[in-house]
Curated annotation (Swiss-Prot):
UniProt record, GO biological process: cellular response to oxidative stress
Transmembrane segments: none
Name of this protein: Probable Fe(2+)-trafficking protein
Name of a matching Pfam family: Iron_traffic
A GO molecular-function descriptor: iron ion binding
Native source species: Burkholderia thailandensis (strain ATCC 700388 / DSM 13276 / CCUG 48851 / CIP 106301 / E264)
Similarity comment text for this entry: Belongs to the Fe(2+)-trafficking protein family.
Record flagged with keyword Ubl conjugation: no
Role description: Could be a mediator in iron transactions between iron acquisition and iron-requiring processes, such as synthesis and/or repair of Fe-S clusters in biosynthetic enzymes.
Keywords, comma-separated and alphabetical: Iron
Length: 91
């Protein structure tokens, strides 16, 4: 049976993650309060940030930037947007 949580990002009951997606306290916090659906949304956002900002994931500063963006995306005012990105129009 799926583990249900109240998702901090979506504000509704949803299926929780199967395991902490990151090490440390942030990973534990994400595991306890982020749904699979919200995590998939973050992975798309993260990919855009990596590509648009040409982040080198071997660089500790790039990894630190993404950790801060992860926390802002789920628990803060929202992560940075990729420059020039326009979300698709909703029909």
């Amino acid at each position: 049976m799926a583990r249900m949580i109240h998702c901090a990002k979506l504000g509704k009951e949803a299926e929780g993650l199967d395991f902490p997606p990151l090490p440390g306290e942030l990973g534990k916090r994400l595991y306890e309060s982020v749904s699979k659906e919200a995590w998939q949304g973050w992975l798309k956002q993260q990919t855009m940030l990596i590509n648009e900002n040409r982040l080198n994931m071997a660089d500790p500063r790039a990894r630190q930037y993404l950790m801060k963006q992860t926390e802002k995306y789920f628990f803060g005012e929202g992560a940075d947007q990729a420059s020039g990105y326009v979300p698709p129009a909703q029909d």
